[in-house]
UniProtKB/Swiss-Prot annotation:
InterPro entries: CB, DNA_brk_join_enz, Integrase-like_cat_sf, Integrase_catalytic, Integrase_recombinase_N, Tyrosine_recombinase_XerD-like. NCBIfam families: PRK02436.1 (NF002685). Keywords: Cytoplasm, DNA integration, DNA recombination, DNA-binding. This is Tyrosine recombinase XerD-like. One of its GO terms (molecular function) is DNA binding. It is found in: Cytoplasm. Belongs to the 'phage' integrase family. XerD-like subfamily. It comes from the Bacteria. The active site is at residues 148, 209, 241. PROSITE patterns: CB (PS51900), TYR_RECOMBINASE (PS51898). The keyword DNA-binding applies. Putative tyrosine recombinase. Not involved in the cutting and rejoining of the recombining DNA molecules on dif(SL) site.
Length: 242
């Protein structure tokens, strides 16, 4: 399994110090857990609780990225993800605009990256994203047709997001396997892996959707306009942003 560490690190563009840190943390992880399963992972996470929170977060972030790599490369049969503890500062960031420009950087989880961008840029729900067909995307006009509860709405796409979609739009659905859309569980795994890779494991589909709303409010858009773009029938769920 240790050879997988070298393969994993070779895929990432890291400084010398970062490579050494990843190698140390992951070798220590493998030595401690032995066989990777739910029990060994819980014991590993418990062993970190005496460390500073910043050290815990660094180690757990590296391990989560490595676990996704192992699953993706079929070293392990199941996908595992360790919970990264939140500190008070992180919790207080709820309701505040975050700098998530790192999402536009290249990723080892391209599908998770695109899911994150569709939520952040257009406030789409994972279920809406999974139902997107390639035919719903009109690249020339930079628009996307989204269906929710039998109702369709048109979503305007940014130039950057249009370019991203043009690279991955093939087949019947935007995200598919053998002509059928992936499950929501798959989408959440992809999103979690991407967020972990970018050091944003504390975020979720819901918090990314909130970031979309906050960005729209910053641009002086009304709650009624935002509700319409999100496919909501009223502004009831947006009242807290008044």
């Amino acid at each position: 399994m240790k050879e997988a560490i070298d393969q994993f690190i070779q895929q990432k563009q890291l400084s010398k110090n970062s490579r050494l840190a990843y190698t140390y943390d992951l070798e220590q992880f493998l030595e401690q857990v032995g066989t990777i399963n739910d029990t060994s992972l819980r014991l590993y996470q418990s062993s970190l609780q005496s460390l500073k929170l910043s050290v815990q977060k660094r180690k757990l972030s590296a391990v989560n990225q490595f676990l996704y790599f192992l699953y993706n490369q079929k070293y392990i049969e199941h996908y595992y993800k360790l919970n990264i503890p939140k500190d008070q500062k992180e919790n207080s960031s709820q309701g505040s605009l975050l700098d998530l420009s790192v999402f536009w950087q290249e990723s080892q989880v391209p599908q998770g990256r695109l899911i994150a961008l569709l939520i952040l840029e257009n406030g789409l729900l994972p279920s809406e994203i999974l139902s997107i067909k390639v035919a719903d995307i009109q690249l020339d006009f930079q628009i996307l047709s989204v269906e929710k509860a039998g109702q369709k709405r048109i979503v305007q796409l940014s130039s950057k997001l249009t370019e991203e979609l043009s690279r991955m739009a093939s087949g019947t659905y935007l995200f598919e396997k053998k002509g059928k859309p992936y499950s929501r569980q798959w989408a959440f795994r992809q999103l979690e892996a991407f967020l972990s890779e970018k050091g944003q494991a504390g975020l979720s589909a819901q918090s990314l959707r909130e970031q979309y709303i906050l960005r729209q409010l910053k641009d002086k858009r009304s709650l009624h306009d935002i509700a319409r773009d999100l496919g909501l029938k009223s502004i009831t769920t947006l009242e807290k942003y008044r």
